[in-house]
Amino acid sequence: MGVTKKPDLSDPVLRAKLAKGMGHNYYGEPAWPNDLLYIFPVVILGTIACTVGLAVLEPSMIGEPANPFATPLEILPEWYFFPVFQILRTVPNKLLGVLLMAAVPAGLLTVPFLENVNKFQNPFRRPVATTVFLIGTVVSIWLGIGAALPIDISLTLGLF
């Protein structure tokens, strides 16, 4: 569909620049003004037009209409607050629940200091950070699923 410009590698001047590692700045199509003035606005306006068109042609309700005179049996927060809601719901002392929530970022801040001698970026060569991430992910999913269940089976997820 499109035409791609390729550099002429038989040109001795270009080959000399490439040998010095200077080629990426000296051949091809410049980003200014070709991309920034012509291609990007077309893509942005096309995306906006598709979004507005879909919103006009197929309007969808966000949820059921609110009734201020009928309170639901159990009020649940948004899905991304489920783990925090589960901590506050299951811990009997609310101050302890708030401290547990504050301990999560504090614990995450200590992970780099535990592995400060390890300079690798590969997760398999950073066992402490990988273990903290995996355990945190599993606990967060476990708490999130438990928050949607009744409180008597929320900690065991109804499995035990």
Swiss-Prot record:
Q: What is its main location?
A: plastid
Q: Where are the transmembrane segments?
A: 36-56, 95-115, 131-151
What SUPFAM superfamilies has UniProt attached to this entry?
A: a domain/subunit of cytochrome bc1 complex (Ubiquinol-cytochrome c reductase) (SSF81648)
One GO BP = photosynthetic electron transport chain
Question: What is its membrane topology?
Answer: Multi-pass membrane protein
Q: Write down the Pfam families for this protein, in alphabetical order.
A: Cytochrom_B_C
Query: Coiled-coil segments, which residues?
Result: none
**Would you tell me the Gene Ontology cellular component terms?**
chloroplast thylakoid membrane
Do the record's keywords include Translocase? no
Q: Which residues form the signal peptide?
A: none
What keywords are annotated for this sequence in UniProt? Chloroplast, Electron transport, Membrane, Photosynthesis, Plastid, Thylakoid, Transmembrane, Transmembrane helix, Transport
> Where does it localize?
Plastid, Chloroplast thylakoid membrane
What does the record give under GO molecular function? electron transporter, transferring electrons within cytochrome b6/f complex of photosystem II activity; electron transporter, transferring electrons within the cyclic electron transport pathway of photosynthesis activity; oxidoreductase activity
Question: What Gene3D superfamilies is this protein classified in?
Answer: plastocyanin oxidoreductase, Single helix bin
HAMAP family, alphabetically?
Cytb6_f_subIV (MF_01344)
Instruction: State the similarity comment.
Output: Belongs to the cytochrome b family. PetD subfamily.
Functional note: Component of the cytochrome b6-f complex, which mediates electron transfer between photosystem II (PSII) and photosystem I (PSI), cyclic electron flow around PSI, and state transitions.
This protein's assembly is summarised as:
The 4 large subunits of the cytochrome b6-f complex are cytochrome b6, subunit IV (17 kDa polypeptide, petD), cytochrome f and the Rieske protein, while the 4 small subunits are petG, petL, petM and petN. The complex functions as a dimer.
The protein here is known as Cytochrome b6-f complex subunit 4
From which organism does this entry originate? Physcomitrium patens (Spreading-leaved earth moss)
